[in-house]
């Protein structure tokens, strides 16, 4: 109830019911067309939703492949390495709806990283992870952000990603 998810939805353009301005370069977000938002989200902003928004009837691999097929960005071998590191390689063919929320969070992070981005926005990314998996997820995310020269925006309440934050803001 502090507005963290709402803040994220302003940044990625899912909500426009705010005062003030959100600018991309010098363009006001409220003035972007649907097509411009699609392009922005496909190539510049990746978003890991708090509620994940995975397709429960699809497998873990299919959920990631949908994004990767749209962007053609990551090599399949890289994605499978991330599945392995995050302990969900044995779930590639499992339906998302049959996986725990923590397993789903790991799959959703892999999906979020399966595209180019200037910023990755992650909303409560480790709420259902143990410390080991949270650390692995943070490492994968930061390595990929560094590789792409991208920024990272993280929201959390309670469980925080252990990162070397440049700036923090409390809402």
PLM feature spans:
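Short coil-to-helix segment of the ABC ATPase nucleotide-binding domain corresponding to the Q-loop/switch region
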Residues: 58-65
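ABC ATPase NBD coupling module
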Residues: 29-46
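Conserved ABC ATPase signature
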Residues: 95-103
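Helix-to-loop junction immediately C-terminal to a conserved catalytic motif
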Residues: 12
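Conserved ABC ATPase "signature" region
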Residues: 76-91
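Conserved ABC transporter NBD signature motif
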Residues: 20-29
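Catalytic Walker B motif of ABC-type/P-loop ATPase nucleotide-binding domains
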Residues: 120-124
């Amino acid at each position: 109830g502090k507005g963290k998810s709402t803040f994220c939805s302003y940044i990625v353009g899912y909500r426009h019911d705010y005062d003030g301005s959100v600018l991309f370069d010098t363009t006001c977000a409220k003035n972007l067309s649907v097509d411009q938002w699609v392009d922005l989200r496909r190539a510049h902003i990746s978003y890991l939703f708090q509620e994940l928004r995975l397709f429960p009837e699809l497998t873990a691999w299919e959920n990631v492949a949908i994004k990767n097929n749209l962007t053609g960005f990551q090599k399949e071998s890289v994605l499978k390495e991330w599945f392995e590191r995050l302990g969900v390689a044995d779930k590639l063919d499992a339906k998302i709806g049959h996986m725990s929320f923590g397993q789903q969070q790991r799959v959703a992070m892999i999906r979020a990283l399966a595209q180019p981005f200037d910023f990755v926005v992650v909303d409560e990314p480790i709420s259902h992870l143990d410390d080991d998996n949270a650390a692995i997820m943070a490492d994968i995310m930061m390595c990929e952000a560094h590789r792409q020269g991208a920024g990272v925006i993280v929201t959390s309440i309670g469980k925080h990603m252990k990162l070397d934050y440049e700036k923090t803001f409390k809402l």
